[in-house]
């Protein structure tokens, strides 16, 4: 199916206004590329790591894109949107082009192939199981466009470490579960019960779908939750593949929710922040029992003594 992509360049302060106009015309989706907002986040060091093309970071104005089914009324639609934008009395540039649905809705799938990580094989639902891999613990996943494929080095570090710390009978919490991969992996290792927590309702929906695909609903409970706030069970293992700042915020709560001898696995930590995260874990009472670095990222495993 063909779509019309309409792109409007405006000053950053008008991006939400333009997006609202697109929604008025029943767009199928809106994206905003705002260099000013990106630089605010970068300069505030909210992200430990980021990767954006120079064309976005160095742009003088923001770009708001919207997608509409290509129909015979497209010229009327373009004219109406143009007039609506003019009525705002703000400077803007409008561009448009035809695109295939494949190019923006499904093209990412061609790059997501089965990947081995330690004892596991992560397989997208639309791919066949590679021959000779039947002995692997298979994680089937359909992350959708809202989430990564789970094969990032931070996830791989956790998957490689999990078999040492998750075993039959363990109770596990996966904080910031995202697509649910680490919760699923814990279930495949024999954990008795897993709680998959995420503050993002979209993540909760995606995680539940992936858990259903893997037929693990009886073992994994997905909860929309802010970190461990209000979670009052004592558990054996807590996993947090998030970022350094959040792991530091989580440290004391994780320590208190773990049984004696319990394990905390933290990933998503850039190597430059490894020491401060270690210091925080030690401060609240943990003992560091494993450290591993890969590709500029760090995994820390700590035990409650």
From Swiss-Prot:
Disulphide bridges, residue numbers: none
BP terms from Gene Ontology: methylation
Keywords: Cytoplasm, Methyltransferase, S-adenosyl-L-methionine, Transferase
Catalytic activity: L-lysyl-[protein] + 3 S-adenosyl-L-methionine = N(6),N(6),N(6)-trimethyl-L-lysyl-[protein] + 3 S-adenosyl-L-homocysteine + 3 H(+)
Domain of life of the source: Bacteria
Entry GO CC: cytoplasm
Enzymatic class: transferase
Residues holding S-adenosyl-L-methionine: 155, 176, 198, 241
Function recorded in the entry: Methylates ribosomal protein L11.
Record's protein name: Ribosomal protein L11 methyltransferase
